[in-house]
């Protein structure tokens, strides 16, 4: 399958080391695109080794930038000259026992982080398109919603209505982040 993208400049992939974002980066590099990828800690080999290996295979290339979703302005350098922003950065915690503070662990980075990205887009005149990576959990919050799905095709009117900051906070935060 051929992956084509119409970009006259580099593109930004936030959270480039994440699972979905890494596959996107790989396909973009294979298509010859220059990718500006953001990672929270570019000195951590666990976060960047696989990205450097992708870049070596080309024909596109990756330039890594350190950025934090909650730090205003931290995406400015990474976004310079980019024409498309793929916002894929998002925390994801599988083990519920590791969720100490749903507001801090999910809501702030997902919702306020998305606001930060969109504000930086507004400040970057070269960006023409933003692609937000969301999740099915923005539509289906818990089992009750899965058991009573909307009829027909899903649309922008179909939202997760059962999650809250205290009940499935990841789903709630993804819903609120997408609603921006």
Locate each region found by the language model.
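NAD(P)H-binding glycine-rich loop region in Rossmannoid oxidoreductase-like domains
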Residues: 42-112, 122
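Active-site YXXXK catalytic motif of short-chain dehydrogenase/reductase
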Residues: 170-178
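A structural signal for isolated positions on well-ordered beta-strands in alpha/beta enzyme cores
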Residues: 34-36, 63, 131
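Conserved cofactor-binding/catalytic machinery of classical short-chain dehydrogenase/reductase
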Residues: 71, 113-116, 176-177
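Conserved Rossmann-fold NAD(P)-dependent oxidoreductase catalytic core, especially the SDR/UDP-sugar
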Residues: 87, 91, 96-170
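Conserved glycine-rich Rossmann-like NAD(P)H-binding loop of the short-chain dehydrogenase/reductase
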Residues: 33-44
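N-terminal Rossmann NAD(P)H-binding glycine-rich loop of SDR-like oxidoreductase domains
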Residues: 3-35
């Amino acid at each position: 399958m051929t992956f084509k993208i119409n970009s006259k400049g580099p593109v930004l992939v936030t959270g480039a080391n994440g699972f979905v974002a890494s596959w996107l980066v790989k396909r973009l590099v294979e298509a010859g695109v220059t990718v500006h990828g953001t990672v929270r800690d570019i000195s951590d080999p666990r976060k960047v080794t696989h990205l450097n290996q992708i870049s070596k295979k080309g024909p596109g290339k990756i330039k890594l930038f350190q950025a934090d979703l909650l730090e205003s302005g931290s995406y400015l350098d990474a976004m310079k000259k980019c024409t498309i922003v793929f916002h894929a950065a998002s925390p994801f915690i599988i083990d519920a026992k590791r969720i100490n503070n749903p507001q801090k662990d999910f809501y702030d980075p997902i919702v306020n982080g998305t606001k930060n990205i969109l504000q930086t887009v507004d400040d970057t005149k070269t960006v023409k398109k933003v692609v937000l990576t969301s999740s099915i959990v923005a539509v289906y919050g818990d089992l009750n919603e899965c058991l009573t799905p909307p009829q027909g095709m899903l649309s922008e009117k179909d939202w997760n209505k059962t999650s809250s900051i205290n009940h499935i906070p990841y789903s709630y935060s993804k819903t609120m982040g997408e609603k921006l």
